[in-house]
Amino acid sequence: MGVPLAPAFSAQTNPFWRLLSQGTIHTAGMQLSNGAVVLPFIAAHHGLTWAAAMLFPAYSIGSIAGHSLSPAALQRAGQMRHLLLAVSAAISAALIVCDAVVPWTGVFAAAVFVLVSAGGGVVVAVSRVAYLDLISSKLSEFRRGELLLVKGAIGSVLAVVLTLFVVPMLGHGDTMAYHRGLLWLGAAGLAASGLAALFLGPVRAVSASTRMSFRETYRLGFAVARSEPWFRRYVITSLLFAPVALGTTFYALRTAHQGGGLHVLVIVTSIGLVLGSPLWSRVHRRFGVRGMLVGSALVSALAAALCIVAESCGLWQHIWAYGSVFLLATVATGAVVAAGISWISVLAAEQHRGTLIGFCSTLVAVVSTVLGGALGGIAQKHTTIWPVVVVLILSVIAAVVSLGAPRRAHAA
């Protein structure tokens, strides 16, 4: 299934910087309106408890639909995949505006939050597959990994600066105004990233192929899973890392019920991405995909262990306690996507890459729908420690399974 890299990547310097600029703005916008941290925290903080628990399952259901649609969307977009990114960013911004303007009380507000999360899942899934396919077409393997890590770091720094110096001016000391201002800035960032996407330009000529139906998409995915051992390992490992990816949402819900500050979570999450960028870059160079995944799972387990100690000692309400846990959870999450892309982008044939990414992401979304609802519910049982123990056990299982990942991306 391996396919050689396209020649003359070294001559393409401009695409990297345009992709980095667009990705940085998009990352900052996503950080300020983060569906895994900001929206669940706001919902729980303002009394929309059941909605807070349902946000990630709703997002996952939308993600299932989005990943099912992504192969067809890529084929319809053809070489103009940058336009697909632009439209996706504009829709994402509009959805965040809906959350920002609705009164945060009652069933109607809860329904809006849930529906926006579901719609966001669709849009983000299509956008993610399109973005990964676009950078795979424009950049070499090394530059792809570098882009994913660096854009996350710079975008996070931008999010921290906005959170510290701009959002407080919008809030005027009022908590609700502060939360709404955060969402408005996030929407503005997403809209700006949509404009930047227009300047990315079309991809190189894509392979002509017939448009596949949903059934054909999954038929191809299962066929590759049966015939290619590397893809089976990739899918199983991705499924078991779903709890690691849910870590920040889990701790956001626990923090919202115990007096934590949203601005602290946004800043700490952004710092975690900044610190994680050079860390995982070094790990990838020395230990490859396996090192990134094992390290990610172990850091997630460390976050859970620290949370257990802090809650047992009555220290969870302190900024240093929940801030440290959030920092570790964010660092752990940051390695998962980059490692997965490094694993699949070289081994998958170019004409099947988008389909296989969408197929695997759909399976992960199915698991996350069930797991997210369960973890979202137990996370709000803040008077007991056993929910954190569950997260610790799942992280350890992920660490053990990830030992089967290749040390290098080309090692099947």
Can you annotate each of these PLM segments?
Residues G2-A65, W230-I267:
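Helix-loop boundary and gating motifs at the non-cytosolic
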Residues L39-H45, A72-R76, A100-W104, A159-Y178, ...:
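Transmembrane alpha-helix termini and helix-breaking/packing motifs in multi-pass membrane transporters
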Residues T49-W50, E141-V150, E350-C360:
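Loop-to-transmembrane helix entry/capping segments in MFS-fold secondary transporters
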Residues G66-M80, L170, G276-R290, A379-Q380:
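Helix-to-loop junctions at the C-terminal end of transmembrane segments
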Residues A89-V107, V299-W316:
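C-terminal ends and interior cores of transmembrane alpha-helices
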Residues A125-L139, G334-A348:
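Intracellular juxtamembrane helix-capping segments at the cytosolic ends
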Residues G194-R211, L403-A412:
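Helix-loop junctions on the cytosolic side of multi-pass membrane transporters
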Residues G291-V337:
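C-terminal transmembrane helical hairpin of 12-TM major facilitator-type secondary transporters
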